[in-house]
């Protein structure tokens, strides 16, 4: 699959979707994107910057949601203009899609909306690549139905069907907890869509702090290594210059000054894994 200006798949190095959870300010966004660009260029990692203009799914009505669509999209546009990076952001309603698609290179659907057929259809008809997040409540094999919905809508609109990714971000495990089943990554390959692993939301503790979500960022490297060893097309990670001061999802964000070391390990592992054949089908 061609994504932005690079090829993605299990026969290619993993690509990275990374950035802050939410757009907090223009300067911090440009600085964070610039630092990530430097790291990824050094390691030859294809990179898409991500951040949200609005966090519609919040634990509390008093939680910070963002700078608003107009200002958030303007800032993401500056990332493209100043740094030459492709950008991704999530959309939350059908009404937002046209305006968002006019700015960003890749759309993302929130996990909780993966079963909303009209919403998935509308995103697919945008003409943009779409990173479709698997709901925390969904079995991995059920993502085939979601991807098929997107492909059907694209085909009916006369657009390419080869623009959709399936993203794993953990599954609910009791109250206020998520777990990641690495078998899901292999199962989701059966969608014939590139599989992306979200290593930071997978360590989230949803609503775990009462009015906000907690997280266990110390396990991000553990799950990221496991996903790369399993074999993925891409990784998704949120980062922040100072996670303790992040306005959204700080507890599961990777400190920006640790991203380089983490990615260096993951690149080495990815190269070793993809030099050898995947044996899953040989065991049937």
Swiss-Prot record:
EC number: 2.5.1.55
Pathway: Carbohydrate biosynthesis; 3-deoxy-D-manno-octulosonate biosynthesis; 3-deoxy-D-manno-octulosonate from D-ribulose 5-phosphate: step 2/3; Bacterial outer membrane biogenesis; lipopolysaccharide biosynthesis
Cellular localisation: Cytoplasm
Family per record: Belongs to the KdsA family.
Gene3D superfamilies associated with the record: Aldolase class I (3.20.20.70)
Name of protein: 2-dehydro-3-deoxyphosphooctonate aldolase
Lineage of the species this protein comes from: Bacteria, Pseudomonadati, Pseudomonadota, Betaproteobacteria, Burkholderiales
Chief place where the protein resides: cytoplasm
Membrane-spanning ranges: none
């Amino acid at each position: 699959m061609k994504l932005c200006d690079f090829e993605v798949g299990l026969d290619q190095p993993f690509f990275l979707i990374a950035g802050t959870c939410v757009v907090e300010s223009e300067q911090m966004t440009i600085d964070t994107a610039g630092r990530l660009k430097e790291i990824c260029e050094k390691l030859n990692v294809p990179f898409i910057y991500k951040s949200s203009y609005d966090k519609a799914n919040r634990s509390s009505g008093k939680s910070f949601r963002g700078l608003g669509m107009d200002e958030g999209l303007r800032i993401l546009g500056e990332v493209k203009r100043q740094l030459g990076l492709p950008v991704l952001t999530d959309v939350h309603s059908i009404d937002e899609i046209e305006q968002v698609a006019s700015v960003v290179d890749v759309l993302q659907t929130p996990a909780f909306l993966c079963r909303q057929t009209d919403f998935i259809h509308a995103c697919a008809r945008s003409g943009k690549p779409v990173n479709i997040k698997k709901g925390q409540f969904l079995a991995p094999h059920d993502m085939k139905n979601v991807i098929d919905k997107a492909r059907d809508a694209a085909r009916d609109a006369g657009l390419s069907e080869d623009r959709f990714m399936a993203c794993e971000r953990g599954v609910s495990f009791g109250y206020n907890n998520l777990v990641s089943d690495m078998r899901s990554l292999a199962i989701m390959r059966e969608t014939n869509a590139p599989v992306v692993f979200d290593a930071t939301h997978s360590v989230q503790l949803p609503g775990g702090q009462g009015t906000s979500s907690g997280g266990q960022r110390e396990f991000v490297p553990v799950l990221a290594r496991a996903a790369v060893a399993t074999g993925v097309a891409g990784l998704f990670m949120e980062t922040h210059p100072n996670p303790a001061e992040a306005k959204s999802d700080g507890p599961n964000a990777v400190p920006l000054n640790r991203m380089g070391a983490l990615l260096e390990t993951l690149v080495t592992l990815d190269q070793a894994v993809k030099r050898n054949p995947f044996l899953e089908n040989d065991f049937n």
